[in-house]
């Protein structure tokens, strides 16, 4: 332990001094109350704070806490002449508490380090030059300067400069993102290369990093079912065990006093034996292993997920996600890129594919329509605007233009009919762009939304994890939906749906399934469905306020494979929680029985309390470590 706090170092020194004094007393030939008086020094050195807290607890009516139980057990041991054991039990207890405090502190420090993404200062441009100010003091519309190596303090738009950004703290991905003038920039990223002047678009309290931190910090308020169970369990468990300990002492003691012939279980015992057993019972009764480790497991799971760019709004959602056996996807922007791209070119005889694409792209040179943008991006030849003239946009039809002196038409079937040109239909899914050159049909170009590179792998991973059903909902045509679903290996698809229809479909699926249903959407247009599903997952939440507000879980980037990562983290967290519950209850049950039978020494009872808690906390800390840490 090289990073102990001042309080922890003080406790360590008390433990060492008390242990040394106890060893000294053990070595001296002391007996009776002389030995008892000598043991008082190490006992009070190591246990004075426990005794003080126990007394305050009694005054305040907090009888059933661990300080009261430990004080009662050790004072009782002292009163029956078990001086060495009283000191040893308190020493063992405080040592366990030190390790426990260290483990909890380390885990919380690790989680805090994960979320240490909010800069403390911003470089504000003023009439007097650059001033270093608190981000909260920067008004919307102000210009800030972000130097290479600095973390972006506020959301804004790049006014001047270009650079690359490290978004790993937000998305979990190490690949830098390029940025230039006009691009949006969000707080929490690290500027890697160039100096940037940024116009602030949001106040500090509404910035992306503030919303993320608020979300993670508030996640502990939404407790999982397991956490709620432990809270209720502890409320009744401790008093029941205390009363059982009291009965374990009083009943045999009374029977010893009044029965002329003792039954077998009382034979050979005296009242102090039963007092010792009752005190052992008391030590075991504290449920701190569960009360501390279960919430810590969920908090660690949420912190570990945030390292991967997955924000979970509470332990209840993490626990629900672990039970998900149906995943429903929106299509556009979730499984597909949500942007048009040329997927096929079908030239007519006498024309080349590159020629058809080039003429179409040149004709669409001045258009801002998404289809025009996709044509220009697909054309590898230079876009020389001097080759284009007499551009005429025909609403609802397309564009007519002169390219290299040739009359070119680019548009839909209505444009072909307007020109009295015979055109060929296409059965491929997507938007069909027909092209004519000097009145002759040159061919058609298919423009379609493309599946994301990892979309198919995401479905494969989900099925490998035991997800029973993957479903796609879309407002697109049945042909397009069938093509995407078939390419990705989805189990079902439902097409041509309005937003209200999607809610209806999800409700139908909820009635069919026994497990939990997760819906994955873009978080902007899918708010009703995100709310209706057992778990609403918004994808692409980086910079999207609507996504962060609408969903239970937010994926900060656009990778569908993150869904499988989120489920793995959820299942691991719930598995660790169950391990801790089973381990703690099993050990306590065994030692309780041993204590009642007089087979458990007091130090074993302390282990069943503090030792089990320490081991459970160490196990809970595993929730912090994810697949990303193994790379």
Language-model features: where?
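Actuator/coupling domain of P-type ATPases
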Residues: 2-5, 26-27, 32-33, 39-125, ...
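Membrane-embedded alpha-helical bundles of multi-pass transporters
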Residues: 1-6, 23-32, 49, 53-59, ...
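Residue-level signature of catalytic and energy-coupling elements of molecular machines
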Residues: 54, 82, 103, 122, ...
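Bilayer-spanning, highly hydrophobic alpha-helical transmembrane segments
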Residues: 15-20, 229-264, 281-298, 578-607
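Small-residue-enriched core segments of transmembrane alpha-helices in multipass membrane transport
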Residues: 43, 94, 236, 267-289, ...
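Conserved catalytic phosphorylation-site environment of P-type ATPases
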Residues: 59, 69-71, 106, 120, ...
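Cytosolic catalytic headpiece
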Residues: 113-114, 141, 215, 315-535, ...
